[in-house]
Structure formats: structure tokens, C-alpha cells
Amino acid sequence: MADVKKVATRVSYGGALVELGNERDDFVVLDADLAAATQTGKFKAAHPERFYDAGIAESNLMGLAAGIATTGRVAFASTFAMFAAGRAYEQVRNSIGYPHLNVKIGATHAGISVGEDGATHQCCEDIALMRTIPGMTVIVPADDIEARACVRAAYEFEGPVYMRFGRLATPVINDREDYEFKIGRGVVVREGSGVTIVACGLMVAEALEAAEALAADGIDAEVINMHTIKPLDERLVVASAKKTGRVVTAEEHSIIGGLGEAVASVLAEQHPVPMRRVGVRDVYGESGPAVDLLHKYGLDADGIEAAVRSVL
């Protein structure tokens, strides 16, 4: 996909906030001294009266967002995934999740692709943490178009939402007239009958590339873009598994508690089939160029292709 347009979903997040802010005035944006990196600085420049910086105090950021939400306004709380899901977990759980407030968490710089920032900033556990909070919706958009759509959908959705965005520029794959984003509804981006690949985030583009390589050997892979991890589109997962008989999941996250385990739980209860999970395998990351790290940890088309071949 060398010639395909690439955009980091964190950039899409910042742009979408500005667009939405130009249309609606009933929401605010908050950050924790990372507005340039999370791209919320764009919103600050356009609508300074609706932007709040909590400083390097992520727990306070979430508490402030919760308080604002109790006044009837939607609050977008933005920081790195490591800090949003890690440092501020208690406040997200108790101050936002428990009262089911209208706070939308924009968690950027998620996963191994943070790159040179290293293991301390490469959050590969956030989906697992957020999935366990009752009533929390978890979204991992695959590209620029989907990231922008998910921001608008989150704004319109009643209740807390965790949106996961990346630092690395990734291929735009949803540039088509019939594209539609619905929370909780997965999308079949490639029809197939031999194996199902369920992916999220930047791994969707990698899954499509793997499917093309597999097709050269007569292996017909169906690829599902599962942008919403919670609530999971269980009906689509089961229907595809019944059609293909084999499932591989792919995520830029730990294989513990993420998309893979969510899909495995559904299949174990409703339609067991042979399955493999592509993801970070219970290890910390390390410092290095994002693309090199993704390859090292098997989070690319080659890793997905190998997993598919092992399950056939």
C-alpha cells in the first residue's frame, strides 16, 4: 500500500473536533499538557473558550471532565493512552463510568507504534482495562475516515466512550461512497470463504495486505474491520465463522484482554472453530522505529499471513 494516502488517526481526531466544534457549541475539549501531540491544539486555536488544559495531571483531567459532564455538556478528555487508561484508571472507572457520564476519552499514541518513546509509553493494555468498565464503549478506528466518523458518533452517543488513536500515519482504506460507521457494527471489507481475519486499528490495512498475499496461493480470506471492541458485533463474528470455519484476530494490543479474547469468548460460547490471535504476546515493548517494531512483534501482514497458514 505504498501509494495509498496515509494519515495518523490522532491527526484525524484533532481535525474532527474542530469540524464538530464549528457546528455545535455544547461540548468542550480537555487535555493534559499534550495538545500538540494529541492534536487538540487545533480545537484550542479555533475555540479557545471551550478548551481546558489540566496540566500534567491526568487523574484531575478525568475528574474535571466528569464534573463538566454533570452540567449537561459533552466533554472530550484527551491524553496519551498510557495515561488515559493507566494513570487515570480509577477516575475513569469511578468518576466517569460509575455514573455513566457523557465523557468521550480521546486516547492517542496507543500501542507499539508509539515507537522511540519506548515501553513506558507503549500502552498495549488499554483495551483490556477499558473493556472491563461496565457501560464503557471502546472504539479503535482503522483510518482517517473512520476516526473522524467515530468522533462524531461518540459525540452523539449517550454514555462514556473510549476512542483509541495512533501516532503512526496509516493507509486510508475506507474511501468509498457506501462507507457507513455505526457503533457496535463491524464491517466486512473483503469477502471470503476460507478463513476469517478480524482486525482493528492499523491492523485492518495489514489484514487486507495479508489477504492479497494469501489469495495468490488460493486461500480466500474474509476480512472484518471490527472498529468497535465493546459492544462487539457478535452476530457478524459468528456468521463469518460459520461461513469460513477458521478465525484469526489481529490487533496492536496485548493478546490478553483485547479484540482476540473478545472474539474468542463469543466463539467459545456460540460457535467454536480453530482460531489464532495476532497481537503483543505478554511482553513489554521497546524503543525503535514504529514500522520495525511492528514487524518484530509480528504486527504486520507477514505476521497475519503466518497465523492464517497455521490455522488452515
Task: Give each language-model segment a name.
Residues 1-164, 169, 180, ...:
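Thiamine diphosphate
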